[in-house]
Amino acid sequence: MNNLLLHFFCVAVGGAIGASARFAMVLAMQSFGVRAFPFATLTVNIIGSFFLGLLLAYAEQQPVSETTRLFLGVGLLGAFTTFSTFSVEVVALASQGELLKAALHIAFNVIICIAAVFAAMMLYSTTVK
């Protein structure tokens, strides 16, 4: 298999796993009656951001193969997190007159997800050194 096909395969397999995991998270949260606020999207974005931060921190210290980076970073975590769903949820909340919820959804996703990346990188750097 040439490198390009292998890279597509890594992204596709990782993406299938990540998208399935996100779907499972949504179903799990809905089964607990969590519907008033889009916590499932927020949760997957925070978790995905944290693990992407760990991957980036690890890659700064250790060599990571292109296939691993594509499988984990682009495929699995890229499909697990979701900017498009986040965007649709913000528009839906705003359209329903839920402006505070829309604003909180934006703020939480941006601030907490960036903090999760930072926390993961700091955690990795303090535990590895």
Swiss-Prot record:
One of its GO terms (molecular function) is fluoride channel activity. One of its GO terms (cellular component) is plasma membrane. Na(+) is not transported, but it plays an essential structural role and its presence is essential for fluoride channel function. It is a multi-pass membrane protein. Pfam families: CRCB. Its main location: membrane. It is found in: Cell inner membrane. GO terms for biological process: cellular detoxification of fluoride. Keywords: Cell inner membrane, Cell membrane, Ion channel, Ion transport, Membrane, Metal-binding, Sodium, Transmembrane, Transmembrane helix, Transport. It catalyses: fluoride(in) = fluoride(out). Na(+) binds at residues 78, 81. The keyword Repeat does not apply. It comes from the Bacteria. The keyword Plastid does not apply. The chain crosses the membrane at residues 8-28, 36-56, 71-91, 103-123. InterPro entries: FluC (IPR003691). Fluoride-specific ion channel. Important for reducing fluoride concentration in the cell, thus reducing its toxicity. Belongs to the fluoride channel Fluc/FEX (TC 1.A.43) family. This is Fluoride-specific ion channel FluC.
